[in-house]
Amino acid sequence: MTREQLSLTVLARAGFVGLSSVRAELEELATLTGFPVDDLLPALLAAADPDTALRLALRLLRRAPDQAAWFLRSWKDARRLLRVIGASEGAAEFFLRQPVELASLHRPVTALPTAAELREDLLDAVGAVGGFASVAEEEAWTALRVRYRRRLVQLASFDLEQDDPVAGFDGVAAALSDLAGAALDASLAVARRQASGSGPGRFPEAEVRATRFAIIGMGKAGARELNYVSDVDVIYVTDGAEDAGVPPGRAVDIATRLAVLTQRGIQDPALEPGLWEVDSNLRPEGRDGALVRTLDSHLAYYDRWAKGWEFQALLKARSLAGDWELGERYVTALAPRVWSSASRENFVESVQRMRERVTDNIPDGDLHYQLKLGPGGLRDVEFTVQLLQLVHGQTDGLVRQRDTLSALAALAGQSYIGREEAAAFSHDYRTLRLLEHRLQLRHLRRTHLMPRDEVEVRILARATGLAASAGQLLTQWNEIKHRVRGLHERLFYRPLLSAVAAMPNEDARLSGEAGLTSEQAQARLAAIGFRDPRGALAHIAALTAGVSRRATIQRHLLPVMLQWFSAGADPDYGLLSFRRLSDDLGGTHWYLRMLRDSSGAAERLTRVLSGSRFVAELLGRIPESVAWLESEEELRPRAPELLREETAAILARHESAETAAAALRAVRRREVLRLAFSGILGFSTIEELARGLSAVTENLLTGVLGAIRAARDDAAALEFAIIGMGRFGGRELGFGSDADIMYVFRPLAAGQDAAHRAATAIVADLNRLTEDSALPVDLDIGLRPEGKNGPSVRSLDSYRAYYARWSLAWEAQALLRARGVAGDSALIGDFETLADEVRYPASIGEQAVREVKRIKARIENERLPQGADPARHLKLGRGSLSDVEWFVQLVQLQHAAAHPALRTPSTLDALAVAAGEGFVSGEDAARLRAAWVFASRARSAMTLWTNKTADVLPFDRVVLDGVARLLEYPPGAASRMEEDYLAVTRRARAVFEREFYGPPQRPATTA
C-alpha cells in the first residue's frame, strides 16, 4: 500500500486515533521490520490500542534493535507482541527495562501453567535449594521480579488470545493467584538466606531451617481470584520445633523476620520495581496486632476476641506459601469457627452494615465509576454469595467453597438459589472481573474505576471484546450493574419460599428451585432477624399454600417482602400482621392487584406492619385502608375542610345520634390510621401530625356534639361549646395524647338551672358517644376551674365570676392554650374574649411570677412518678416538654399584653415570636425547640411501637430500638438515640434553669 493509498479513513477503520502522526510511524515500523504496511495493519488492528502498540513497538526497536527485530521477524510473532503491548503499556515498560525478555513471547502460550510449574520456575530464578536461595539480596529480588513478570506477560498473551475471555476468566485468575503464591515462596527462600547467619536480625541457619512458617492467602489470593495487580492479603502463622531447639517464642521472632524480609522482596523499591503490596492487616487485631503468631495464639484470638467480619474474611483462607502442612492445619482448625460464625448474635446485620459502610465511604465523584465497590459492582456479588455461604454452610458442607464462582454453582446445586439466577450472577461477575482485569493490565496498576475518558473506554471495549464502541460498552456495563444490584437485593430471600410452598408438582417449584428443609429455612429466617423462625415459617406456609391466585401472587411477592420485613424493627410481628391482613383481604381483586403490581405499596406495608403495633392493630379493624399505600396523596393528612364536609354529610344521613356518632368514630379511626401511616413513612413532620391529630379530634367532637344537639333539639334553650386546653388547644396532640377540654354553656330560653341540667346531659352524652374501645378518646377536664373539685360544666357567667374572684396563677396559665374547638361560635368568641382578659394581663407582679416558678418546682418534686428518672421522663423530666412549655407560658404571661403576636395557643409559634421579640436568644430558642420536638416525637413513637401510652424513655433495648427506628435512626441505634435525647434535653434544661428560674431565685428541687 502506497503512502497515497494509506488514507486517514483506512487508518481510522484500523482503530487508530492519532491520525496525524500514524502514517509516518507506520512507514518507520515497516522500514525497521521489513514488513510491508499491508501486513502490519492487520497485526496492529488486533491490538486494543493500535496507537500505543505502534508507538511502543518503535520504542522497543530503538531501545533494543537486535532483540526486537529478531522477535519481529515473523508476522505471527509480531501480531502476538503487538497485541500484548497494545493492551498493556505496563508490559511494554517491562520489555523496555528487560529487552531480553521479549523472548518470553517467542512461542504462543497455548495452555495455562500449573501451580507446581510456576513455583518451580520462580524458585529456580533465585537458585533455591531446600528452601534457601543461593542468590544475594538485590540480585535475588531482581531475578525474582523479572521471572515473575515474564510469566505475567505470558499469562496476558494467553488471556488476550482467548476466543471467549469471559468464560476463561476464572482460569486466568487462578493462574495469577498461583503465580503470586510462587513469588511469595521464592521471596521466602531469599528471606531465609538473608535471615541466616550472625549479626543483628540474623539467626543460626539451623534454627531458621527448623522454624515452621506458613503464609495463608486471604481474600482473592486465598480464593485463587487475583487480578493482574492486586494487593495480596496474607496472614502469617508459625509453630515452634521443640525437638530442634526452637521454642514457640523463638519461632515467632524468626518467623517475624522472615515475614518482613519476604514482604520486602515483593514490594520494596529495587532495580526492577516491586510487584504488588503484601497486605497483612487481616491478621488478628489488624495493624495493632503481632505480625506473626503461633497457631495456638491464632485460635485463642478467634475464640475470644474476633468480630463477625473477621470470620467472613477467613472464608477464603488457604495455604499459599511456606510450610504447606502448617498452613493446612491452620485452615482446618479455623474452619469450624468460620462456619459457625453466622449463629453469632446480629451477625447478618453487622455484615450488612459493613457492606453499607463500604458504599458510604466511596467518594461521591467515584461512586458511578466503581467496578468493585459501587452499587451493582463486584462487591454486591461477593457479599451476597459469602453471606449465603456463611448462613447455609453451617449445616451444608457442599457450599463451603473459597471462590465466588464455585460457591455460586454450589449454592445453585443445593437449591439455595435458582439456577437461572446463579447463571446470571456468574456471567455478570465474570464480565465485571474481565473489565477489571483489562483495566489493570493497561498500566499494570491497581484500579477499580472505569475510565471517564471516551478514548480509554473505547480501548477497554476493544481489549475485552465486549463491544465495538465506548457507548456500547457503557450501556452494557450499566445493564449489568442494574441486573447485579437487583439480584443482590433479592437473592438472599427468595429460596425461603420453596421450603413451604405446597406445590404438588416438583417442576412447578419457584424459580426452578428444589425445596429447603424446614431446618434450613428456619436457619435462614433466624439469620435475617426473625426471633421466632418456626412461627414465621408457619405464616409463610399459610400464605403460600395451595394453587389459588392469592397463594400464587404471594409466593412471587413474599421473597422480597421477607427482606423488607427483616429490615424492620419487628419482622415477626410484621409477618403475623401481614398474614392476618391477607386472610381478611385475600379474596378481593384490588388487594391482589396491589400486591402484584405496586412494589411501593408492598414495601410501605412491610414498613408499617413491622414498625408499629399501633398501626397493625388499627389496620386489622380497617383493612381496606391498605389501599392508601399506593398513593402518596392518600398518605398525607386530610384538609380540615374536607373533614368538615364529610361530617356534615354524616349528620345529614343519620337521624340517630348513636348511628351518627358510630360513623364519626369510624372516621376518626380511619384518619388517625392515615396519620400514623404518614408519620411512619415520612410524609408528615411532627408539627403536621400534631395539627392533623388535633383536627381529627376536633372534628369528632364537633360532629358528635352536633348529633347530640340535633337529637335533643335544644338549640333555642342554650348555647354550648367545648374549649380545647393544653396540647389539644395548642393543636399539639400526639398519638395516644389525652384531649384536655372544658365545657361552657349559656342559657337562652331556658332558666339557669334548666340550662345547667341540659348542659350536664350533653356532657354525659358526649362521654358516652365518643367512647371507642378500638381507639379510646380520653376527654380530660382536669384543667377546669377548681380542678377535680370543680363542676364538670359551667356557664359563661360562672367562669367570669370565678376568674374575677378566685383564679389562681396556674388557671390563668392554663388558659394560655384555651381555644374553642366545637359548639356555638358566638359562645366560643365570648369565652375567648373572657380568657384573653385573664391570660394576657396588662402586667404581672413579681409575686405572681414567683408563684408560677414555685408551682413548677413543686411539680418537679411531686408529680414525677415514684422511681422515675427525671432525665428520661418525656413530659415532666428535665429539659422535656414541661420545661419548654412553662418557659414559653411565663413569657406569654409577662409580655403577651404588649406583644399581640405572643397570643397564640401554640408552644412553638409562641417560642418563635419570643425569639423574634428578643425575650430569648435565637440559640436558646433553638435548643428549647429541639428538645420539645424530640420529646414529642419520642412520645408518639412509643405509642406507635407498643400500642400503649407512656411518658418515660424505656430502658428495654428492644423497645428503645423500635422507638429509635420510628425516629428514623438506623438499625441497632437505640443507644445513639438515647444519647441524643439526653444531650438535647440537657442543653434545653440549662437554658430553662437560666432563663426561667434565674440563679438567685430558683427554688430548691429534688427532682
Swiss-Prot record:
GO terms for molecular function: [glutamate-ammonia-ligase] adenylyltransferase activity; [glutamine synthetase]-adenylyl-L-tyrosine phosphorylase activity; ATP binding; magnesium ion binding. It comes from the Bacteria. One of its GO terms (biological process) is regulation of glutamine family amino acid metabolic process. This is Bifunctional glutamine synthetase adenylyltransferase/adenylyl-removing enzyme. Residues 505-1007 are annotated as: Adenylyl transferase. The keyword Oxidoreductase does not apply. Its cofactor is Mg(2+). It catalyses: [glutamine synthetase]-O(4)-(5'-adenylyl)-L-tyrosine + phosphate = [glutamine synthetase]-L-tyrosine + ADP; [glutamine synthetase]-L-tyrosine + ATP = [glutamine synthetase]-O(4)-(5'-adenylyl)-L-tyrosine + diphosphate. Transmembrane segments: none annotated. Its EC number is 2.7.7.89, 2.7.7.42. Residues 1-496 are annotated as: Adenylyl removase. Belongs to the GlnE family. The keyword Ribosomal protein does not apply. InterPro entries: GlnE, GlnE_rpt_dom, NT_sf, PII_UdlTrfase/GS_AdlTrfase.
